[in-house]
């Protein structure tokens, strides 16, 4: 027999559009032309009365929006990288490091992540490496397809969600387990910053916590907490 399946397309509502607009503005990830183009299209989804309310709410933030210093448009680059990831294409990139030195790399791109203002390309170098290398997308000066592809068995596919939970400040490196105590005012902030963190015990307001993380980024964050953190096992 036949079964009638009801299908409907729901537009974003004004509350969802406001939330997305706030996230875009706060991220500072896009240069003004790209940002305003997205905001205009989002707000255009609203009925006129709600449209004017949202425009009023974000008017000041939009006017005083301060883009990042690199000033580069990123939407095309993000799309091209995403297609290369999907097609498992080996890329040749020309990259400018933080110190201004240019380097060329053959990479196997596996994911794009966003963290604290910047988009990052996660990839493996053409020569086999144990853990991925991270490149800031705005520092990729040139990108070319090599015409070659790479294969990753399904069981070994890169899981960007799992990686994201274990990398801090986009510093790559080997996977480590860190154990520390925390005596600050908000253990919730620690759990939010370190998604793999687990509380082992709590005594007199001091929490013993363990977390998994790649690289040295976690050391930088723990060090920034001052005497509220004491590292037990590193």
Spans of features found by a protein language model:
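Bulky hydrophobic/aromatic content
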Residues: 11-96
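Core beta-strand-centered patch of the WYL/Sm-like small regulatory domain
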Residues: 60-179
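Conserved short beta-strand edge segments in small beta-sheet-based binding/regulatory domains
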Residues: 137, 143, 228-234
């Amino acid at each position: 027999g036949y079964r009638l399946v009801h299908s409907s397309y729901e537009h974003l509502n004004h509350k969802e559009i406001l939330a997305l607009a706030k996230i875009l503005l706060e991220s500072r990830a896009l240069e003004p032309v790209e940002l305003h183009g997205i905001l205009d299209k989002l707000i255009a989804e609203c009925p006129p009365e709600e449209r004017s309310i949202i425009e009023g709410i974000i008017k000041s933030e939009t006017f005083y929006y301060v883009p990042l210093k690199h000033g580069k448009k990123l939407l095309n680059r993000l799309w091209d990288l995403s297609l290369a990831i999907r097609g498992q294409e080996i890329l040749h990139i020309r990259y400018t490091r933080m110190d201004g030195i240019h380097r060329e790399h053959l990479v196997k791109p596996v994911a794009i992540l966003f963290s604290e203002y910047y988009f990052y390309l996660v990839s493996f170098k053409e020569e086999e490496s144990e853990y991925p290398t991270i490149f800031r997308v705005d520092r990729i000066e040139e990108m070319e397809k090599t015409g070659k592809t790479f294969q990753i068995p399904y069981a070994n596919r890169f899981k960007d969600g799992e990686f994201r939970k274990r990398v801090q400040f986009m510093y790559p490196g080997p996977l480590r387990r860190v154990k520390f105590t925390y005596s600050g005012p908000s253990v919730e902030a620690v759990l939010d910053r370190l998604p793999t963190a687990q509380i082992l015990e709590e005594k007199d307001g001091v929490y013993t916590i363990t977390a998994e993380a790649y690289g040295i980024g976690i050391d930088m964050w723990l060090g920034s907490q001052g005497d509220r953190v004491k590292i037990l096992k590193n």
